[in-house]
Amino acid sequence: SGYRTPVITGNQIYIINEDGKLICLNKDSSDVYWITELAKYKKGQKAANLNLWLGPYLINNLIYNISYFGELKVVSPISGEILLTESIGVKGALVPPIILSDSIYLSDENSNVYEFK
């Protein structure tokens, strides 16, 4: 599930719902452009372990989403297609990242800070 502020750009609103779905809506009509499944649970995890998502974040015309279990998913803002899925090795990400220029700074549950470019 997601629990962050939606991103609004142009006529689109991007938001992650409680079921781990990234949704693109029309800002004026609330019509749904597309829905992309990010994953409510991590593979192999019990249903009690929700895969919480940080995001969405619009960076360089791409939508970035980071899971509690250290998975990064980059999504096309136009089609909702998942362009990249990658393990970033950060478990316990619960605090929104800091985004500066071309870098993303993320901390884990042990207060370690990581930089991604």
Predicted regions mapped to residue ranges:
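Extracytoplasmic beta-rich repeat domains
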Residues: 1-9, 35-57, 85-101
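Conserved beta-propeller blade signature
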Residues: 13-15, 23, 62-65, 104-106
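Histidine/lysine/aspartate-rich catalytic loop segments that bind and position anionic ligands
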Residues: 23, 27-41
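Short loop/turn segments that connect beta-strands within beta-propeller blades
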Residues: 26-30, 76-80, 117
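C-terminal hydrophobic structural anchor segments
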Residues: 52-77
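C-terminal/domain-terminus segments
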Residues: 73-91
